[in-house]
Amino acid sequence: MLPLSLLKTAQGHPMLVELKSGETYNGHLVNCDTWMNIHLREVICTSKDGDRFWRMPDCYIRGNTIKYLRVPDEVIDKVQEETKSRADRKPPGVGRGRGRGREEGSGARQVRGAGRDVMMQVAKAWVEVRGRGASAGKSGGRGGRGRG
């Protein structure tokens, strides 16, 4: 479970945010963005010492100042159910890039022409010839692109 998916699911729920400075903020999550910046409503801020309290209608917390977040268990359960249902709907291997080496299926690329094995043999033969110092144009067979 990713932290941002957890925060997106926690919108509208109460949460506790502790900052690196030691202050804590209790409130209802309104919104969060990709940098984990958080907007809370009906906030109670507690000082680092725990002896002073402030009530605010809303507050914005920058993501890189957050030490940890405490969300209700029901939100965590809901996220786990969503990720499980998402995994059940999608067959394995779908949506994870182009993949490699599969010839069956709708997204597979069909091999045309001489085929991969023949092309590999040609490439190996070319490397062997170049490696033995055979003359290859202006460069004299010493590698490089032959400039000069």
UniProtKB/Swiss-Prot annotation:
Q: Which residues fall in a compositionally biased region of kind Basic and acidic residues? A: 80-91
What InterPro entries does the record tag this protein with?
Lsm4 (IPR034101), LSm4/Sm_D1/D3 (IPR027141), LSM_dom_sf (IPR010920), Sm (IPR047575), Sm_dom_euk/arc (IPR001163)
Hydrolase found in the keyword field: no
Q: Which cystines does this chain contain? A: none
**What is the superkingdom listed in this entry's lineage?**
Eukaryota
Subunit info here reads: LSm subunits form a heteromer with a doughnut shape.
Spell out the protein name for this chain. Probable U6 snRNA-associated Sm-like protein LSm4
Q: What is the lineage of its organism?
A: Eukaryota, Viridiplantae, Streptophyta, Embryophyta, Tracheophyta
